[in-house]
Design a protein with these regions (language model features):
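Glycine-rich oxoanion-binding loops at beta->alpha junctions
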Residues: 1-15
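A short, small-residue-rich loop immediately preceding and capping a beta-strand
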Residues: 12-23, 41
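Flexible, glycine/charged-enriched surface loops at secondary-structure junctions
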Residues: 13-14, 100-112, 140-160, 248-254
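Short glycine/serine/threonine-rich phosphate/pyrophosphate-binding segments
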Residues: 20-31, 49-52
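Short, acidic/small-residue loops that bind anionic groups at enzyme active sites
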Residues: 35-55
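A structural-propensity feature for long, helix-poor, extended segments
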Residues: 56-96
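Oxyanion-binding "anion nests"
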Residues: 132-183
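C-terminal non-catalytic interaction/assembly regions of soluble proteins
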Residues: 166-285
Length: 285
């Protein structure tokens, strides 16, 4: 699909590639592509995290077109799309992905070096590598590892708990859900709910919202700190809920309109993570 887009653009050799989001398998595929094609991977992405829609990128905020876009499936079907807006790119790609069996590979947001410099979130590949090094280190005690991780990501630990219930539904090609955790250790007696649409969007502790999109809500294993994705949530799983601030590009008016809580249907005005922590939360989702 990468080569198909290159031919469509009339470019003999693409100068490099980059991940569209720093989350899940989508952060790794560009590394494989770069290695197989013998080209550099640029140390940036378009989200600084993961979001459920293709238009939810800082490139979109900067007016960069997401198309031409190439899309393929495991059967070998390949399509090229040129759309009138990034919103239409998301709609058409979502429909095609559903028809392809709910899984597809895409090559998207062809961009110049200047566009990457102006609109990308820089250093995200390097940061991801450093996070992985901390999590996988065997010479650190659990408390030291957590402290080092939180310092690296400028994050907070929100909650320690055991997964008690997960409600899921698939709608419009998205995985919606609500996870309920029962507090452990210092959080014993408290309850946390996490609402997600592919990615975690809202964290609520004892009825008060304590973190909201576009700030990041990350669930990790209580002991190993290995990431726990929404797909891997199951009863009995012991989890730490961490949070870290989003990139400043998302805190603009256009950024909040694109990925803030109201876009996802929550009756909340965005309050930054650390400001919300000082206030002690925001009542009701």
């Amino acid at each position: 699909v990468f080569q198909k887009l290159s031919r469509y653009l009339g470019i003999e050799e693409i100068a490099g590639t980059f991940p569209m989001e720093a989350g899940g398998v989508n952060s790794m595929i560009p590394i494989v592509v770069a290695a197989s094609q013998g080209i550099p991977i640029v140390d940036c992405d378009g989200m600084g995290r993961a979001f459920p829609e293709l238009r939810m990128t800082t490139f979109n905020l900067g007016g960069v077109s997401s198309t031409p876009m190439a899309i393929t499936d495991e059967k070998g079907n390949i399509g090229i799309s040129e759309t009138i807006s990034n919103k239409w790119t998301e709609r058409l790609a979502r429909v095609q992905t559903v028809e392809m069996g709910a899984s597809s590979l895409i090559s998207i947001y062809p961009a110049t070096g200047r566009q990457l410099k102006d609109h990308g979130i820089h250093g995200i590949v390097t940061l991801s590598e450093k996070i992985g090094e901390v999590i996988r280190s065997n010479d650190l005690e659990e408390a030291t590892k957590l402290e080092k991780l939180l310092k690296l990501i400028d994050g907070l630990e929100l909650f320690q708990g055991k997964m008690m219930d997960v409600i899921r539904k698939v709608e419009g090609g998205f995985n919606f859900g609500e996870a309920t955790l029962e507090g452990l250790n210092q959080d014993a007696g408290s309850t946390m709910k996490i609402y997600f649409q592919n990615e975690n969007l809202i964290a609520e502790k004892d009825g008060s919202v304590i973190t909201m999109t576009p700030d990041l809500i990350c669930m990790v294993d209580l002991e190993t700190l290995m990431p726990v994705t929404t797909e891997a949530l199951k009863y009995g799983k012991r989890i730490r809920v961490l949070a870290l601030p989003c990139h400043e590009k998302w805190q603009t008016k256009e950024g909040i309109n694109t990925v803030g809580p109201r876009y996802f249907g929550y009756d909340l005005d965005y309050i930054p993570l650390k400001e919300l922590a000082i206030k002690g939360g925001h009542k009701h989702v």
